[in-house]
Design a protein with these regions (language model features):
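Generic hydrophobic alpha-helical segments
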Residues: 95, 173-176, 476-480, 556, ...
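Short secondary-structure capping/turn micro-motifs that flank functional sites
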Residues: 339, 531-532, 551
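Short acidic-hydrophobic, aromatic-tinged amphipathic segments that line or gate anion-handling sites
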Residues: 543-559
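The feature marks cytosolic C-terminal regulatory regions of anion transporters and related permeases
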Residues: 370-543, 561-567, 585-586
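Intrinsically disordered or compositionally simple regulatory linkers and C-terminal tails
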Residues: 1, 560-586
Length: 586
């Protein structure tokens, strides 16, 4: 079945040569080095210390097990050519809460159920449906998770002498202030030094992985100066040198029903982040992932991680991006990344005991900053009030209540607002391409029909009819990928788009970026008042340029002709204004 055929097999069928392997080898090793401190940090942040001791497990080792097993399975079975799987920051909040309340058995149960839910989502072809989750909801809970991750690292970053960190956000900060006097100067200095190293290398030498440099440098300093700083060895006793023998996890059937909402949240987070990562990768390599195949791979990856004592996994956007930038072209790079981590465990695991926890806290603080999406957050706040409200509600619920509640309430609220807006607007249709033989637009009674105009070769004209909401945003991407070759000029008619939301604007921004990569000039025609105001408030007008937006199709076609070096043509005498501001020019 082509829909579920892994990209790894498809690549091998097409032919895999030495040049591709060399690129994948370099990328895989590079990503493995970058993933090393992240995997350990995610494991430490996800499992409470008391739970780890009671279950006899090592949190940093659990992170590495997940990166190796899930990372290999995602690449081997996935629907994306360059996706890198493993533990991510998005899971820290939900995993920590489950482990703290239900113990390791509860976490294994929830992760296993989440794996089967992901398999079911993929088999039932829910890959396209998950893309309809509105952008403000995703940004809201992602930014909320970032705040929680940052706040959870204060204890290790400053070396505070306190017991278990409270799970509640407010209680957590109360505890920090109560124990602020116990901060440890060497620990804080190591944490600040690690954070500064990561930030400065990212700013001035982004090709060098700042996290691994910070980890190596701080480990050497702490060891040589014999500083009183907690390390992986002092708290967890080191890391095993090999993977454990796969075994049936301590699944609790009694807890299964109670943990079903948490398992569903893990599955939804894994699905959303993995498909977002795949979309980002598509934009970088010009490909197209198989969403349903990717969900099936994520399901097997989470099931496999549980059998090796791991934690939930998904596609990692940062590592996937690093893979592409390092030259990765095929799933082989992801499998090499997993093997690289396995070799580290076999050869260098004794040295991992010297890694300071303050440095890993600094690594996670940078992860939190990257997850915060502050620019997108601000942009949505300037979007229509309904989108801003959904964003703030999802963000607030994530930080102050529970991630499971936040995702559910955010999706329901966005759906209700969407249905209300759709009910208020008539004449809604889908994205359509105008051709001379299109019955709906070739009627003689339509004076602005495309068949009345001469469209030059090298110019494509598409039209969006109806409100451009999150439910329609993904369709424009599908239309783009059906084009055999990029045109010189792409005209997008928006005369029938009366309303656009933040997800629609985000889709247009990605569309514009793709056009720029393809050497295509994007022109918008017939932009109404509400979309124009939304463009201006969100900054899209500055991105595309006001010179590329026109009140009617005829002006846009003449601009396209000028781009192609062709003479302009007069508009048909029967043409009528398409938008209100165009009436003065007719």
């Amino acid at each position: 079945m082509p829909r579920y055929l892994p990209q790894s097999i498809a690549i091998l069928r097409q032919g895999y040569d030495r040049r591709q392997f060399v690129g994948d080898l370099m990328a895989g090793v590079t990503v493995g080095v970058i993933a090393l401190p992240l995997a350990m940090a995610f494991g430490i942040a996800s499992i409470p210390e008391g739970v780890a001791k009671a279950a006899g497990v090592s949190p940093p080792a659990m992170g590495l097990y997940t990166a190796v097993v899930a990372g290999f399975l995602v690449s081997a079975l996935g629907g994306s050519r360059v996706q890198i799987g493993g533990p991510t920051g998005a899971f820290i909040v939900i995993v920590y809460g489950i482990a703290q309340q239900y113990g390791y058995a509860g976490l294994a149960t929830a992760t296993l159920m989440a794996g089967f839910i992901l398999l079911l989502l993929g088999i039932c072809r829910f890959g396209a449906v998950i893309k309809f989750i509105p952008y403000p909801v995703v940004t809201g809970f992602t930014s909320g998770i970032a705040v929680i991750i940052f706040s959870s690292q204060i204890k290790d970053f400053l070396g505070l002498e306190m017991g278990a960190v409270p799970a509640d956000f407010v209680d957590k900060w109360k505890a920090y202030f109560q124990h602020l006097g116990s901060w440890n100067l060497p620990t804080a200095a190591v944490g600040l030094g690690g954070l500064a190293t990561i930030v400065l290398l990212r700013r001035f030498e982004p090709r060098i992985p700042g996290a691994i440099v910070a980890v190596v440098a701080s480990s050497c300093i702490v060891y040589l100066l014999k500083l009183d700083v907690q390390t992986i060895g002092t708290r967890f006793g080191g890391i095993p040198s090999r993977l454990p023998v796969p075994s049936l996890p301590p699944v609790s059937l009694e807890l299964a029903r109670e943990l079903l909402p948490a398992a569903f949240t893990i599955a939804m987070l894994a699905a959303i982040e993995s498909l977002l990562s795949a979309v980002v990768a598509d934009g970088m390599i010009g490909g197209r992932h198989k969403a349903d195949c990717e969900l099936v791979a994520q399901g097997f990856a989470n099931i496999g991680a549980v059998f090796f004592g791991g934690i939930p996994a998904t596609g990692a956007i940062a590592l996937t991006t690093a893979n592409v930038k390092s030259g990765g072209k095929t799933p082989v790079a992801g499998m090499i990344h997993a093997v690289t981590l396995l070799l580290f465990m076999a050869v260098l695991s004794p040295l991992a005991s010297a890694i300071p926890l303050a440095t890993l806290a600094a690594v996670l603080m940078m992860v939190a900053w990257n997850m915060s999406e502050i620019d997108h957050f601000r942009s949505i706040l300037r979007a229509p009030r309904s989108d801003a409200g959904v964003l703030l509600m999802t963000f607030g619920l994530t930080v102050f209540t529970d991630l499971t509640v936040a995702v559910g309430v955010g999706i329901v609220a966005a759906a209700l607002l969407f249905m209300k807006q759709m009910a208020d607007v008539s004449n809604i249709s889908t994205i359509t391409r105008e051709f001379a033989d299109d019955d709906a637009l070739a009627e003689l009674k339509d004076p602005n029909a495309i068949n009345r105009r001469d469209v030059p070769a090298g110019v494509e004209v598409y039209e969006i009819a109806g409100p451009f909401f999150f439910g329609v945003a993904d369709r424009i991407k599908d239309v783009l990928h059906r084009l055999e070759r990029p045109p010189k000029v792409f005209i997008l008619r928006m005369r029938k788009v009366s309303v656009i939301d933040a997800s629609g604007i985000h889709a247009l921004e990605e569309f514009h970026q793709k056009c720029q990569r393809d050497g295509t000039r994007l022109l918008l025609s017939g932009v109404h008042a509400q979309p124009l105001v939304a463009f201006t408030r969100c900054g899209f007008t500055d991105v595309i340029g006001s010179q590329n937006m026109f009140g009617n199709l005829d002006d846009a076609l003449n601009e396209a002709r000028a781009q192609l070096g062709l003479p302009s043509e007069r508009a048909p005498a029967s043409a009528v204004p398409e938008v209100a501001r165009d009436r003065a020019g007719r």
